[in-house]
Regions:
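Charged, solvent-exposed interaction patches on well-folded alpha/beta domains
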Residues: 1-18, 23, 27-33, 41-251
Length: 251
């Protein structure tokens, strides 16, 4: 009974929740969640809000589960009556926009989610017109909820990003990548016309090798001059065949 009384002693009861570091996450919602976690008693006797017996593990678990934009989380007591929650938010580097490019161009950019640099989906994205963010169109599997999922293994995702960066360095401008049912990738390039040219490559391709092949081809004057001079009429560049770079223009 004495310990129960001590746990409720006002001097040691947390009454103030401060949330810092948020930009997009609602700080008030975080504070409300923490207050909910520390309300009530343990086994009807010991007050959860007592600074010495706070349910810190549950607070951490609940924040990370509900606010998946959270990348780093620090929970710190300030005196006896204040709890400071410091959050570092994930930054959105890319978008995942479903399993395929919408046939209706007006829906491009709808229903997208932010991805971090590991390919982890952590938040819904507002509508962006144009190509503000690079987009991934990759099937997640049946009944897989997007939030909290990885679009690809972290290793594969980073490998594709490295390939995209390499293509960009060659003077081309990737805007999205699609993985179709045949496990083949289509890397779409920006264009001033309605139809975007694309680079085709296989899922099992060694991306370092095919990037090297593309680099070698672009450094050949005849290839470079033809592709760049007719860029807006380019249909595709095909890297699916070993040590070959094929290309085709729209007729």
């Amino acid at each position: 009974i004495g310990l129960s009384y001590f746990s409720k002693y006002p001097k040691f009861v947390v009454t103030d929740i401060k949330v810092e570091g948020t930009h997009i996450i609602d700080a008030q919602a975080v504070g409300d969640l923490v207050m909910e976690d520390i309300s009530g008693n343990y086994i009807y006797l010991f007050k959860k809000a007592n600074t010495f017996i706070l349910p810190e593990a549950k607070i951490r678990e609940d924040i990370l589960e509900k606010f998946q934009r959270t990348e780093k989380l620090e929970i710190k007591r300030v005196g006896f009556r204040t709890l400071l929650i410091t959050i570092s938010e994930r930054s959105g580097s890319y978008l995942w926009c479903g399993s395929s490019i919408p046939t209706d161009s007006k829906k491009l950019g709808d229903d997208c989610y932010f991805l971090n640099t590991d390919g982890y989906i952590f938040d819904t994205a507002p509508y962006f017109s144009g190509n503000v963010y690079f987009k991934f169109y990759v099937p997640l599997g049946d009944k897989v909820e997007p939030m909290g999922a990885y679009v690809l293994t972290s290793e594969t995702f980073k490998s594709i990003i490295s390939f995209i960066d390499g293509v960009t360095a060659l003077g081309l401008h990737p805007i999205s990548v699609v993985m179709n049912d045949e496990k083949q990738y289509e890397l779409y390039l920006s264009s001033t016309i309605t139809s975007n040219p694309k680079i085709l490559f296989n899922k099992e391709s060694d991306l370092t090798t095919i990037l090297s092949n593309l680099n070698a081809a672009i450094n050949k004057p005849e290839f470079k001059n033809e592709v760049l001079s007719k860029y807006n009429n380019l249909n595709y560049i095909d890297l699916r065949f070993k040590n070959k770079v094929l290309y085709k223009f729209n007729e």
